[in-house]
A protein has these predicted regions:
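ATP-dependent helicase/translocase motor core
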Residues: 1-223, 228-248, 269-273, 279, ...
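Short, well-structured beta-strand/strand-turn elements
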Residues: 29-34, 249-259, 332
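Hydrophobic transmembrane alpha-helical segments of multi-pass transport and channel proteins
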Residues: 220, 330-334
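Conserved helicase motor
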Residues: 231, 253-264, 278-283
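Walker B catalytic acidic pair
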Residues: 277, 329-330
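Post-DEXD/H (motif II) to motif III coupling segment of the RecA-like Helicase ATP-binding lobe
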Residues: 335-343
Length: 343
């Protein structure tokens, strides 16, 4: 068990205690070098593992193979964690003691409060902030992909309109064609967020489903969250998915991919598009059941009830990497204020 933080410790040791706790939450077994056994569980995190560049703060093993390193820093280092990325890379490229050298693809820098992550297999690797460390099975999957990462696949998605047809010939409106092409360009540039702004009645949901179809078709088996703020919006989205037929396939979207409105306290296996209210997602992240009437309450009324931001902790059954893409319908009502932490 991880020892509680004691505040007379050195600040970096305090950070390591928090990191230990977060690793354990994510399914890692913590070990010292003295008791090193990389086959003890699927995911093993070894403290102070020796390399020819000095001990690395944590070396992470998946199924007995080294896959990641963590460079730990004290909490007040959070705003300048990017300055230690070179140090992390040096440790990852160093010769490891006791075992044959392996290519370390995954790098973390963490204060325990702020954590940054780099996948060196990406086409243009760069660090990004993450909520927690990834689970062992996640790193195992990503390691098996090698250079064929999600971001590599996003860059390789073919053009929607290589023959420069009119939008009508593609079964789209001009604004829909522009939105889909711009979204694809944004994802290819590795921009993590994008905003689609369209007039009322312009077909935003149809546009979103068109983008989802292309993401699922060209990036493989993925999970998409379609987040709404009312039950009615979720049901409307489901109905549009039921009748949506892509221009390059005669089958309906829901014949190709499993899309469901989430109505239970868990997400069923095999669902590729999860349609969910932000209220239910909050209950899923809390690991709690919710009363159905609560889901029909408008966000504004929830905010009047709650008054302060909703706390969200790590949920092992629904880790941050569970979804590959998140679409937020009517996002101006949910991405700020009390619901921001849920996202």
């Amino acid at each position: 068990m991880t020892k509680p933080v004691t505040y007379n410790q050195h600040p970096e040791q305090q950070a390591r205690d928090i990191i230990d706790k977060k690793l354990e939450q994510a399914g890692w077994t913590i070990q010292s070098v003295k008791h090193f056994n990389p086959n003890n569980s699927l995911g093993v995190a070894v403290r102070e593992y020796p390399t020819d560049s000095g001990p690395v703060d944590y070396l992470l093993f998946v199924d007995g193979e080294p896959v990641a390193i963590i460079e730990a820093k004290e909490e007040n280092f959070g705003h300048k964690l990017n300055t230690v990325e070179e140090q992390s890379a040096r440790y990852a490229d160093s010769k490891l003691k006791y075992i044959e050298q392996a290519e370390i693809a995954f790098l973390y820098e963490s204060t325990g409060v702020v954590t940054r992550f780099t996948n060196r297999n990406d086409p243009a690797p760069r660090a990004r902030e993450v909520f927690n460390f990834h689970r062992p099975e996640t790193l195992q999957k990503w390691a098996s992909e090698g250079k064929n990462t999600l971001r590599a696949k996003l860059k390789a998605i073919p053009a929607l309109n290589p023959n420069h047809l009119s939008a009508a010939e593609l079964g789209l409106r001009d604004c829909q064609l522009t939105a889909i092409e711009n979204m694809q360009d944004s994802l290819a540039k590795d921009l993590p967020r994008a905003l689609i702004q369209m007039a009322t009645g312009a077909g935003k949901t149809y546009t979103a489903i068109s983008i989802m179809y292309r993401l699922l078709k060209y990036t493989g088996k993925r999970r998409i969250l379609f987040l709404v703020d009312t039950v009615n919006l979720g049901e409307q989205a489901e109905q549009e998915m039921l009748v949506f037929t892509p221009s390059d396939d005669n089958r309906k979207f829901t014949e190709l991919y499993n899309a469901q409105v989430i109505k239970s306290p868990h997400i069923p296996k095999g669902v590729e598009v999860c349609i969910c209210t932000i209220q239910r997602m909050y209950s899923l992240l809390k690991g709690e059941e919710m009363a159905i009437p609560d889901e029909s309450v408008e966000l504004e009324e929830w905010e009047n009830r709650l008054k302060e931001p909703l706390p969200v902790a790590y949920q092992p059954d629904l880790p941050p990497e569970f979804f590959d893409f998140i679409f937020i319908d009517e996002c101006h009502r949910s991405i700020y204020n009390l619901w921001r932490q849920v996202l």
